[in-house]
Amino acid sequence: MRKALVLITFLLLLPMWVQAQKVGLVLSGGGAKGLTHIGIIRALEENNIPIDYITGTSMGAIVGSLYAMGYSPDDMEALLKSEDFKRWYSGEVEEEYMYYFKKNLPTPEFLNIRLSFRDSLKIKPQFLPSSVVDPVQMNLVFIDLYARATAACGGDFDKLFIPFRCVASDVYNKKQLVMKRGDLGDAVRASMSFPFMFKPIEIDSVLAYDGGIYNNFPTDVMRDDFHPDIIIGSVVATNPTKPKENDLMSQIENMVMQKTDYSIPDSEGIVMTFKYDDVNLMDFQRINELHDIGYNRTMSMMDSIKSRIHRRVNLDNIRLRRLVYKSNYP
């Protein structure tokens, strides 16, 4: 009799679960400003707002992928404050791992160009820097950081702790690349490879650059791949402004980045837009400040968010599910 009651209760509740409101979180690119996303996620978690799907570009892909593979906001903060992360985005090598016998003698030059007059005047491209940041440290960190998550999901991003997509750019064919399977580290690494700053990587014979070139706020990917009932968007970037004579990054942005639609129709969800006056691409040391900006804005909008999203998830249950998921890591 008891088993029958349990079965009946389950069958009665099943339609509610099947029809439960699904929530998608879309995170824009924006360099260090993307640290704001962590504060948003923390505020949503603390208020029992569900996050069922995540899409992100560039820094949004980094934060989104970490959460999707089972990192808590505390875990993300700890990682992004670590010395390992500083070496990742700066390209610096620890002193103990530097092998000076392989290094050329230091010179004051920024780049070295050699000219050949043998056949015709030409610049040998191997003497131009491929990126400002040496990619070796970043590549090693990405292997260590994402390898187990890739193995646990079998290369299927739908099987992460939270289903996830990120966007990279195919600059040859002038289109976005939606990353939904394969090596998670490669997908995120491609999504944040801003031209000149970071070296691109090759995925399936395609040279993949920062997703922000063609789609810095992938709401379309969220709609097409996951069909959520409501979308929460976090926008920490703007379309390129008029370039300045002495600002190389603004010049590059204007040359390569297409305009992005950072809006979400009211009927589809909520968008939080953040404006910054003095935060640069690499200001990662300001993580506490940027986290709090996201957290405080989300808390100020919580009544509005709760009025649109009626479903709740218990934070203790999320933590338990996270532990269970990560226990399957090889």
Stretch-by-stretch model annotation:
Residues 19-57, 65-330:
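Patatin-like phospholipase
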Residues 4-18:
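Sec-dependent N-terminal signal peptides
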